[in-house]
Amino acid sequence: MDEKIINPTKKEHILVCLSSAPSNTKIIQTAAAMARAFHASFSALYVKTPASEYMEAEDKNRLLANIHFAEKCGATIVTACGDDVPFQIAEYARLSGITKIVIGRSVVGKRRFFGRPTLTEKLISLAPNVDIHIIPDSDAAIAKGKKTLFE
């Protein structure tokens, strides 16, 4: 068996994407577990968009709770500003040496053949050298009667 180990000294760096979604705590828990398993650095990124200014109070409170939860789980909290969320995530990942991104996805909607790409599709194309882990929100899918990403 002649297997080569590619860059065995490369340190893993996990990035979790923060949001006001109720399922974001599950995403944060998954990313924190990955960081522990890989003995990796752990960061949490919130991308503040112009629309963030109009977020409802309930969503703002949930976002703050998710930020505090990520911090409690050991993440370094980072905020980026911009209107292109996938670009901001990919750019932060590139500049910070992120090796894995953990992001949530509520439900899979029907995308038309020529429709706009989803946030995760854009992120995959903008960060081709980063492992991207998409965590579906099964509860939201069941509540809405839609299929999850992996069904």
Question: Which residue stretches match the model-derived regions?
Answer:
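Small/aliphatic-rich secondary-structure junction motif
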Residues: 5-58, 69-72, 78
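Intrinsically disordered or low-complexity boundary/linker segments at protein termini
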Residues: 1-25, 125-151
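Residue-level detector of structured alpha->beta connecting loops
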Residues: 39, 74, 97, 128-131
